[in-house]
């Protein structure tokens, strides 16, 4: 499993393990993915960090921010309301809880990258008029 550097720097949690670190040698049945020792707090932290990143780095009218906030808030609500990991997996529908942790870490990483690139701004160079014409149809 991957490590998320930002989670190593969160002082308030006092967890002995990195939140996205795999358990030691307990397989999930998927190649390269091991059981997470405590997935619920990891997901709550990842989702809260993603929401914080979106609010700090994206304008309110950004389509990416709106859609990602809606998805993240929905998943956060599910994780906070359910204690049983199997119920969380079924309600989210993203596979095993370890896969959901990986997805959440990837979404946080993507939000940080897109925020730095300011993808909501206009292009510096306007595209040519025929740039998006394929097979005689303008897209």
UniProtKB/Swiss-Prot annotation:
A Pfam family this chain is assigned to: ETC_C1_NDUFA5
Subcellular locations according to the entry: Mitochondrion inner membrane
GO cellular component: mitochondrial inner membrane; respiratory chain complex I
Membrane topology: Peripheral membrane protein
GO biological process per UniProt: respiratory electron transport chain
Signals that turn on the gene: Expression is repressed by CAP2/HAP43. Expression is up-regulated by H(2)O(2) in a HOG1-dependent fashion.
InterPro entries in the cross-refs: NDUFA5
Disruption phenotype: Increases the sensitivity to the oxidative stress agent H(2)O(2), as well as to osmotic stress agents sorbitol and KCl. Impairs the yeast to hypha transition. Causes significantly more damage to the host macrophages and causes significantly less damage to host oral epithelial cells.
Alphabetically ordered keywords of this record: Electron transport, Membrane, Mitochondrion, Mitochondrion inner membrane, Respiratory chain, Transport, Virulence
Chief place of localization: mitochondrion
Role summary: Accessory subunit of the mitochondrial membrane respiratory chain NADH dehydrogenase (Complex I), that is believed not to be involved in catalysis. Complex I functions in the transfer of electrons from NADH to the respiratory chain. The immediate electron acceptor for the enzyme is believed to be ubiquinone. Involved in osmotic and oxidative resistance, yeast to hypha transition and the ability to damage and invade oral epithelial cells.
Protein family: Belongs to the complex I NDUFA5 subunit family.
Protein name: NADH dehydrogenase [ubiquinone] 1 alpha subcomplex subunit MCI4
């Amino acid at each position: 499993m991957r490590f998320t550097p930002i989670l190593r720097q969160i002082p308030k949690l006092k967890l002995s393990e990195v939140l996205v670190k795999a358990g030691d040698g307990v397989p999930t049945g998927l190649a390269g993915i091991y059981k997470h020792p405590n997935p619920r707090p990891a997901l709550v932290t990842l989702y809260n960090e993603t929401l914080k990143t979106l609010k700090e780095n994206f304008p309110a009218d950004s389509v990416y921010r709106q859609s990602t906030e809606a998805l993240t808030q929905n998943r956060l609500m599910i994780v906070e309301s359910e204690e049983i990991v199997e119920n969380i997996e079924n309600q989210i529908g993203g596979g095993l809880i370890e896969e959901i942790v990986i997805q959440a870490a990837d979404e946080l990483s993507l939000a940080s990258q897109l925020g730095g690139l300011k993808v909501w701004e206009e292009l510096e160079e306007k595209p040519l008029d025929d740039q998006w014409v394929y097979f005689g149809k303008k897209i």
